Amino acid sequence: MTTAFTPYKATVLRAGAKGTAVKVLQAGLGGIAVDGSFGPATTARVVSFQQSVRLPGTRVVDRATWDRLELTVHPLFPYWGTVAKRGSSGANVVALQKALRITADGSFGPGTETAVKAAQTRAKLATTGVVATLTWRAIEKQM
């Protein structure tokens, strides 16, 4: 599984950098122009983001910063490759239930299935009640 951030995780960015990696960074950070130029506004936003996720405010976008940004933008990313359905249990089901804003007991029962089907309907997906990659992504967008 990949996101827009995946190709750039080995790329270290700092003030003065330019290009597509900077645009991806800026879009992920939000609240700043997406112009592909790592200037003062991007630097300030990077430091603010780093501090908000308890990373040192280094002004440098390294692997740790890319990883945290990816999880901030795609909080369900760790589960995209998993399948959850009635009878499933565990951390992925807890994350699913929290994303659906229902009681998070870690057990995929009829209530979770109903909530999943509603999310699938809103996303114009087949209403199977089974959560695989497309449904994970759709639920994430609905968060």
Question: Which residues make up each language-model segment?
Answer:
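Cell-envelope/ECM-targeting effectors and their regulatory/trafficking segments
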Residues: M1-M143
